[in-house]
């Protein structure tokens, strides 16, 4: 497909996952370390993936357990904040996935 090569620069892109740590509202969110820790870990993973040569990155709320079919507002807001703060460092095409909630995923993507 021609569009794949146009978007990713290759016919067989490697899309890597950047799994975000538990965020505010999640049962396993570490309030002591706060959002700075979530952001720092996401930045570390993003840079490692890009330096490793991936063609794209997908951000996901992997550690927002348990997965919900309707994620909490603070999950979407936290993901938006993290991705927004990393935006200047993102060098490849990227996407978002709010696990089990396609509407929230689209809200973030737009």
What does each model-identified segment do?
Residues 10-11, 16-17, 68-96:
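Alpha-helix-loop-beta-strand connector modules within alpha/beta enzyme cores
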Residues 1-7:
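N-terminal carbohydrate-binding accessory modules
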Residues 101-110:
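Catalytic cores of alpha/beta
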Residues 19-44, 93-102:
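Active-site mouth loops of central-metabolism enzymes
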Residues 10-24, 48-61:
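N-terminal glycine-rich anion-binding loops that anchor highly charged ligand groups
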Residues 50-78:
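Glycine-rich, proline-tolerant flexible connector loops at the mouths of alpha/beta enzymes
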Residues 41-53, 85-88:
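A short, N-terminal amphipathic alpha-helix
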Residues 2, 84, 107:
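Active-site phosphate/pyrophosphate- and oxyanion-stabilizing loops and adjacent acidic/basic residues
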């Amino acid at each position: 497909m021609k569009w794949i090569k146009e978007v990713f620069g290759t016919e067989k892109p490697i899309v890597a996952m950047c799994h975000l740590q538990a965020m505010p509202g999640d049962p396993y969110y570490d309030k002591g370390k706060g959002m700075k820790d979530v952001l720092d870990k996401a930045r570390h993973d993003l840079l490692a993936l890009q330096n490793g040569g991936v063609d794209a990155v997908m951000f996901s709320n992997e550690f927002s357990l348990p997965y919900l079919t309707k994620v909490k507002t603070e999950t979407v807001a936290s993901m938006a904040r993290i991705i927004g703060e990393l935006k200047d460092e993102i060098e490849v095409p990227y996407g978002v996935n709010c696990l089990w909630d396609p509407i929230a995923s689209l809200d973030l993507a737009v």
